[in-house]
């Protein structure tokens, strides 16, 4: 390993430490500290996760445009991570743009690296339910449950759609 690799590994390690500190601050609802630490993590070694989580904190403060910008930056860093696509869709929903959100939820479902595809399915279920496309909503709530069997909100949504369709 050459010196550059050593320095890169050290920066990556430091960024990871800052990321974990930021997440702890976020969990403690210390959003300003979390923002500061996520930004320092990104400055040290940019990752899609740090950009996505910084956006998440912005969303807690209703700073949706900044949250979307961070998610777009996350996608530029690593387009394989599914979280920023789903998050952009969620932020657009929060801004009242349900039509714009659909393509982002669908892109999340195509991302190769995502812990739980249940969330974009659930979000699509909500969008389709609001548009009164109950069959599509039921399908996505069901797919969310298939991905995450204990997903209570998806189960409730699916039951609600089943009662509407009967």
Residues of each region from the PLM?
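Alpha-helical segment of the N-proximal tetratricopeptide repeat
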Residues: 11-49, 53, 60
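TPR alpha-solenoid repeat register
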Residues: 50-51, 84, 118-120, 154
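Structural marker of alpha-solenoid helical repeat scaffolds
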Residues: 10, 43-44, 77, 111-113, ...
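Structural signature of tandem alpha-helical TPR/SEL1-like repeats
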Residues: 28-37, 61-73, 95-110, 119, ...
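Residue-level recognition of tetratricopeptide repeat
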Residues: 14, 47-48, 81, 115-117, ...
């Amino acid at each position: 390993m050459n010196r550059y690799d050593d320095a890169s590994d050290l920066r990556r390690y430091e960024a990871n430490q800052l990321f974990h500190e930021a997440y702890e601050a976020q969990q403690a609802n210390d959003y300003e500290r979390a923002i500061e630490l996520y930004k320092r993590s990104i400055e040290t070694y940019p990752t899609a996760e740090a950009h996505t989580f910084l956006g998440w904190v912005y969303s807690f403060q209703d700073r949706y445009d900044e949250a979307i910008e961070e998610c777009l930056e996350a996608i530029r860093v690593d387009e394989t991570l599914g979280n920023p696509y789903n998050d952009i869709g969620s932020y657009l929903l929060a801004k009242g743009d349900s039509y714009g959100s659909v393509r982002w939820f669908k892109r999340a479902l195509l991302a190769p690296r995502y812990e739980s595809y249940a969330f974009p399915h659930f979000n699509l279920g909500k969008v389709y339910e609001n548009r009164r496309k109950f069959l599509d909503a039921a399908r996505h709530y069901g797919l969310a449950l298939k991905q995450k069997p204990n997903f209570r909100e998806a189960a409730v949504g699916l039951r609600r759609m089943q009662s509407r369709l009967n």
